[in-house]
Amino acid sequence: MAAIKPMISVEYIGKATVVRFTDEKILEEKDIQALQDSIMPMIESASGGINLILDFGNVQYLSSAVLGLLIRISKRIYENDGRLLLCNINPKIYEIFKITRLTKTFDIYKDTESAAEDLS
């Protein structure tokens, strides 16, 4: 597993690239920018689209700016014929996804294995 700074680790499972957020909090603008700078090149460099699973298992708090980043990531992935799947979302954070109706925008799974299975 390759570590990418600052707050993610990357793993490959079958057809999926799994990005795990390693920090409990994603709140600062500089951290959100760093995430974008780490994830967008993966999307751009994937030939034929990327199947990206974002694993929120460690995340307890996130700012609303992260939701905007997720929408930008999603748009870029779908433009390149890939898929974005989210998993392991904390119940409190999941409530935010429900309130903002992002549960209708994103494919959300219980865990990484379920998400990866959907891609096979």
Model-predicted segments: where are they?
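Short hydrophobic/aromatic patches at helix-to-coil boundaries
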Residues: A116-S120
